[in-house]
Amino acid sequence: MKYFEFTFDTHPCTETVNDVLAAVLGEAGFESFVEREGGLTAYIQQSLYNEETLKTELANFPVPDTEISYTFAEAEDKDWNEEWEKNFFQPIVIGDRCVIHSTFHQDVPKAEYDILINPQMAFGTGHHETTSLIIGELLDSELTGKSLLDMGCGTSILAILARMRGAKPCTAIDIDEWCVRNSIENIELNGVTDIAVSQGDASALQGKGPFDVVIANINRNILLNDMKQYVACMHPGSELFMSGFYIDDIPAIRREAEKHGLTFVHHQEKNRWAAVKFVL
C-alpha cells in the first residue's frame, strides 16, 4: 500500500494547534501523525488523497490566526519502529495500572498491565488523549467473560488490554492493511489469544456479534455515520464506548446515539478531547 508523507508547518505551533490539525486531517483521510518541531508529519494512502478536500479543510481551520503550509512526497513502505525512536516515543503509564512501551525501551515502569507495542503505520500507542481516555474506561469496567469489539483498532492496544482484563472473545477490525498487520504483530508480542483481527469498515460487522462491549475510537464523522451498525451487533445491556472527537461534539454524538436506542451514561474529557459511554 503506497502512502504520501506530508510535512505541515504551523504558526503558531502549539499542542492545541497540532491536535486540531490532526483531527482536521483525519477528516480528509489522513490516518497517521508524528509531532515534529514546527508542526506535524502526516500520512495518507495515495489512493485516498484529494487535493481539493485538503485545501477545503485547511481553509476552514477552526483555530483563528493559524498559518499552515505543507510539502509532500511519496513515503517509504517501511517499518516505523525506528521513526518512533527518533520521535521520542516513551513508555506511558495510564491510571497507575497500565504501562505501554515498545521492545526498544529500557527501564520500563512496573504496572498491573504491561503492554508491548511496536508501531508500524498505525499510531495507537496510548499517548493520544482519546486512546488514554478509552484505556481509563476499560480499566474501570468489569470485562471478565465479556465479548468485545474494537472497531478501528489501529495497533489493537485496546483489544489487547481488554483481553488482559478478561474479555473473551475479542474482535478487532480496521480498514487499513498496515493496522491489521501491526495488530497481529502486537497481539503475538503480548502473548494473548482469542483476538480475531480482520480488515474492513463497518460493513464488515454484518453477521457479527452480538457483543457485550463495543469500542470505537475513530473520529466524529465516522462515528455518526456508522453508529447504527455498531448498535446492530449489540444486545440489550451492551456497552458502547466511543472517542476520537472533541467535547463540543458530544451533543451531536448523543443525538445520534439516542436515535438508535442508546442511553447516555457519562463522558470523560482530557485537553478538549472526549470519550463517552452508552448502554443499549
UniProtKB/Swiss-Prot annotation:
Xref: SUPFAM superfamilies: S-adenosyl-L-methionine-dependent methyltransferases
Keywords, ordered alphabetically: Cytoplasm, Methyltransferase, S-adenosyl-L-methionine, Transferase
Family matches, as CDD domains: AdoMet_MTases
Catalyzed reaction equations: L-lysyl-[protein] + 3 S-adenosyl-L-methionine = N(6),N(6),N(6)-trimethyl-L-lysyl-[protein] + 3 S-adenosyl-L-homocysteine + 3 H(+)
UniProt keyword annotation of Methyltransferase present: yes
The protein's name in its UniProt record: Ribosomal protein L11 methyltransferase
UniProt similarity note: Belongs to the methyltransferase superfamily. PrmA family.
EC assignment: 2.1.1.-
Primary location class: cytoplasm
UniProt enzyme class: transferase
InterPro entries: Ribosomal_L11_MeTrfase_PrmA (IPR050078), Ribosomal_PrmA_MeTrfase (IPR004498), SAM-dependent_MTases_sf (IPR029063)
Swiss-Prot/TrEMBL GO biological process terms: methylation
Function of the molecule: Methylates ribosomal protein L11.
Superkingdom assignment: Bacteria
Organism the protein comes from: Bacteroides fragilis (strain ATCC 25285 / DSM 2151 / CCUG 4856 / JCM 11019 / LMG 10263 / NCTC 9343 / Onslow / VPI 2553 / EN-2)
Binding-site positions, S-adenosyl-L-methionine: 131, 152, 174, 217
Gene Ontology molecular-function annotations: protein-lysine N-methyltransferase activity
Intracellular or extracellular location(s): Cytoplasm
